[in-house]
UniProtKB/Swiss-Prot annotation:
This is Thymidylate synthase. Belongs to the thymidylate synthase family. Bacterial-type ThyA subfamily. It comes from the Bacteria. Pathway: Pyrimidine metabolism; dTTP biosynthesis. It is found in: Cytoplasm. (6R)-5,10-methylene-5,6,7,8-tetrahydrofolate binds at residues 51, 169, 263.
Length: 264
């Protein structure tokens, strides 16, 4: 996970101080890219402990097309609680855009099903794209998409994924985003009988909140450990059929958790 640690160090040393929507303030850089070879291990931060249950269940929740936090709460995941309304609704956020992007004629587009089918039928396509950024509905979302658009790429029997993230909370959010999209790439690769390739993470406004700087320095003082290994149930060949029990991360030996407040 050296690319992630290098990003954190780069922002601490070169970031400019900016105000932000939450009123917390950030150190920020604009435009950064990280690459992770998924054959070299599962890209899960080891310099602090991450909550694996939250990462896995959030992705399964997205893939369900769900936008209510009831499923997350049932599975002891609290990462969306601050943004939900009194009924647990978040508006037309990621799951809705991924699975039910509205068409002008009143129908809907299942972008995930479509892209999986395209990968199988035409793996050399340059249109293997899923977007969560819908300008017509951004104002109805509890939180507009931070990880806004991703593209798959097939070469030599390997599936790679590139994510564009418009806004990147480096300390709290980015480790989750890396793991989530790496997991998604593995799942789609298995569904398409491909090997996992690279995860490429392209960031727009990459920032450390000013109340996360000491935590970031603590994390950088720790020695990275060996990456864990992702094991998927090999019998699952449908990306929508995966359950929590079909996903295992083995040999994860992180340093202790570092507490930090979420900027809402």
């Amino acid at each position: 996970m050296q690319p992630y640690l290098d990003l954190m160090r780069h922002v601490l040393e070169n970031g400019v101080e900016k105000s932000d929507r939450t009123g917390t303030g950030t150190l920020s850089v604009f435009g950064h890219q990280m690459r992770f070879d998924l054959a070299a291990g599962f890209p899960l931060v080891t310099t602090k402990k991450l909550h694996l249950r939250s990462i896995i269940h959030e992705l399964l929740w997205f893939l369900r097309g769900d936008t209510n936090i009831a499923y997350l709460k049932e599975n002891r995941v609290r990462i969306w609680d601050e943004w939900a309304d009194e009924n647990g609704d978040l508006g037309p956020v990621y799951g809705y855009q991924w699975r039910s992007w509205p068409r002008p004629d009143g129908g809907h587009v299942d972008q995930i099903a479509n892209v999986v089918e395209q990968i199988k039928r035409n793996p050399d396509s340059r249109r293997l794209i899923v977007s969560a950024w819908n300008p017509a509905l951004v104002d109805e979302m509890a939180l507009p998409p931070c990880h806004a658009l991703f593209q798959f790429y097939v070469a030599e029997g390997r599936l790679s994924c590139q994510l564009y993230q418009r806004s990147a909370d480096i300390f709290l959010g980015v480790p989750f985003n890396i793991a989530s999209y790496a997991l998604l790439t593995h799942m789609v690769a298995q569904a398409c009988d491909l090997a996992p390739g690279e995860f490429v993470h392209t960031l727009g406004d990459a920032h450390l909140y000013l109340n996360h700087l000491e935590q970031a320095r603590l994390q950088l003082s720790r020695e990275p450990r060996a990456l864990p290994r992702l094991v998927l149930n090999p019998r699952v060949k449908d990306v929508f059929a995966f359950t929590f029990d079909d996903i295992a991360i083995e040999d994860y030996d992180p340093h202790p958790h570092i507490k930090a407040e979420v900027a809402v």
